[in-house]
């Protein structure tokens, strides 16, 4: 399945919704979306991964670096995910050292 990316920008939240397979071949699209997030004035960035069907190790590494860059420019990173196996994989990869997990974008708004 090809990767689909949707971006929504509100005053306080820049949201990137990802659906499909995230692998080395599809990472440029996500990289572009994350680059836009570094340029926004929104304090919070949400990366919604509930629509992912797979993610490979190369994509995890690139994602980890991108999230660290967002932290360096002062963005608070949220991973929206309800898939326990994916959350565990993100934790093992060290990605959650740079982000917080939320069940929904609505949960982010309440923080």
PLM features: residue spans?
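STAS-like cytosolic regulatory interaction modules
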Residues: 1-111
């Amino acid at each position: 399945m090809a990767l689909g990316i949707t971006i929504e920008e509100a005053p306080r939240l820049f949201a990137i919704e990802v659906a499909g397979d995230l692998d080395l071949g599809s990472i440029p699209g996500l990289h572009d979306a994350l680059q836009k997030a570094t340029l926004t004035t929104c304090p919070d960035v949400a990366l919604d991964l509930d629509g992912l069907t797979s993610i490979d190790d190369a994509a995890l590494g690139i994602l980890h670096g991108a999230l660290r860059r967002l932290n360096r420019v002062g963005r608070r990173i949220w991973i929206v995910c309800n898939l326990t196996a994916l959350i565990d994989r993100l934790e093992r990869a060290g990605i959650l050292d740079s982000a917080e997990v939320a069940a929904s974008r609505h949960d982010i708004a309440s923080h």
